[in-house]
From Swiss-Prot:
Protein name: Metacaspase-1A
Function: Involved in cell death (apoptosis).
Top EC category: hydrolase
Keyword Hydrolase (UniProt): yes
GO biological process, alphabetically ordered: apoptotic process; proteolysis
Gene name per UniProt: casA
Length: 454
């Protein structure tokens, strides 16, 4: 039995849509430190309109196995945008001297910049800075590392899927004004610049008429499972969340500051929040090597909401390693060598520390597998550090999340950047209006001078 098109309601097995949660009483905000979006409520408010695209975000395939009682039916989608759409036209106008994307989807065997995949090209960008190619195959720490440990980059040439979540908390005391706009802006950006298709997107917003497309806790977790189901090496997955975030007391000892980061679904009052550990277990842990997940979280306290252990500064070095996640593994010493290009030092530091701590390579390997390090290629751009709040901005008279706006603006200005260049570009954009500092985190040590793709 199918769930039906938007507005047709549930079929059997789908449950019932929760009524709007009660008003926030203000006591729920004690960890929000003001929360996302406590700007002047009279400035640039977003007045939600009925969705123009009723089929936007419909599931086009079976959800994960445990949800086979029902599936989303695909509605009618708007015309597909090509690489040369409105954003592409703006790029051609503003990007004199920058490498530009071709006017249409890349041919088989070529990346979105027109280079043959695996050609080993290197470019120079932003002065004399060299952007490194994306290596293929398993990346090992070197001889002497725990047997079997490695990770694999994705060249993002495979299938693309996206999950976009925007929650304005309509009618609640802590209502936001830019989150639904964020999903519209990001979806258009992905279609017009990165070859994503609307039928491969799920968009959850609290102005949706289909109860299954409301950003409830159940729907968010189901959609996260759909996003990662069946992912193969070199696939490109994209996860975007714009809404309230906060912190709650850590219960499993994996957070340095004693708090887990959480996101708040629209029905948090009745269903509760979603903790970072659960998000990690749902969208990071199932991924196999070589699968890319790019995530953007535009919320308060979002710096480690995916529980990724490697956090990078604008200089391209690990800034705030989550020691509790990787304690005793020897991985941090190895990563220091990796950043310096010292493969031998990387291997010896990893092996010696792990062997001393755990008595041998096999035991260290088993322990390593239980950490948050992942062989998949998971990258997160977050709108604030864990101790910061995010800004609900008004850009060009349209309410929007500051991080979402800065990410799109930075890439449109120069689509060919390394990871560290893009992190600096995003911060430069934000600094024109805001004090928050976005950050880059990953599931494995990365070469921050490598070309960013998604």
């Amino acid at each position: 039995m199918s769930y039906g098109y938007p507005g047709q309601g549930y079929g059997p097995g789908g449950g019932h849509h929760q009524p709007p949660p009660p008003q926030w009483d203000g006591q729920q905000q004690h960890h929000h430190q003001g929360g996302y979006g406590y700007s002047n409520p009279g400035q640039g408010q977003y007045n939600p309109q009925p969705p123009q695209d009723q089929g936007y975000g419909g599931y086009h395939q079976q959800p994960p196995q445990q949800y086979q009682q029902g599936s989303y039916n695909q509605g009618q989608y708007p015309p597909q945008g090509g690489y040369g759409g409105p954003y592409g036209q703006q790029q051609q106008h503003h990007q004199q001297g920058h490498s530009q994307r071709p006017p249409g989807p890349p041919p088989d065997g070529y990346d979105i910049y027109g280079y043959p995949i695996g050609s080993g090209h290197q470019t120079r960008n932003q002065g004399s800075h060299e952007i490194h190619e994306i290596p293929s195959g398993t990346q090992q720490f070197g001889h002497g590392a725990p047997e079997g440990y490695g990770f694999q980059y994705s060249n993002c040439s495979g299938r693309r899927k996206a999950l976009l979540i925007g929650i304005n908390y309509l009618g609640q005391d802590a209502e936001l004004h830019g989150c639904i706009n964020d999903t519209k802006n990001v979806s258009a950006f992905l279609v017009e610049n990165y070859g994503y298709k609307r039928e491969d997107m799920v968009i959850l917003t609290d102005d949706a008429t289909n109860p299954l497309l409301q950003p409830t806790k159940e729907n968010i977790l189901r959609a996260m499972q759909w996003l990662v189901a069946g992912a193969q090496p070199n696939d490109a997955l994209f996860l975007h969340y714009s809404g309230h975030g906060g912190q709650t007391k850590d219960t499993d000892g994996d957070e340095d500051d004693g708090y887990d980061e959480v996101i708040y679904p629209v029905d948090f009052k009745t269903a509760g929040h979603i903790v970072d550990d659960q998000i990690h277990d749902t969208v990071v842990k199932p991924l196999q090597p070589g699968v890319r997940l790019t995530a953007i979280f535009d919320s308060c306290h979002s710096g480690s909401v995916l529980d990724l252990p490697y956090i990078y500064s604008t200089k391209g070095v690990i800034k705030e390693p989550n020691l509790a996640k990787e304690a005793g593994q020897g991985l941090l010493a190895a990563v220091g060598s990796y950043a310096r290009g010292d493969i031998g030092g990387m291997a010896s530091s990893l092996f010696s520390v792990a062997k001393t701590a755990f008595g041998g390579g096999n035991e260290a390997y088993e322990r390593t597998k239980r950490t948050k390090t992942s062989p998949a290629d998971v990258i997160m751009w977050s709108g604030s550090k864990d101790d910061q709040t995010s800004a609900d901005a008004t850009i060009a008279s349209q309410a929007t999340g500051a991080m979402s706006w800065a990410f799109i603006t930075a890439i449109k200005a120069n689509p060919k950047q390394s990871y560290v260049q893009l992190l600096n570009s995003i911060r430069d954009v934000l600094e024109t209006k805001y004090t928050q500092k976005p950050q880059l985190s990953s599931s494995h040590p990365i070469d921050v001078d490598m070309l960013f793709v998604m």
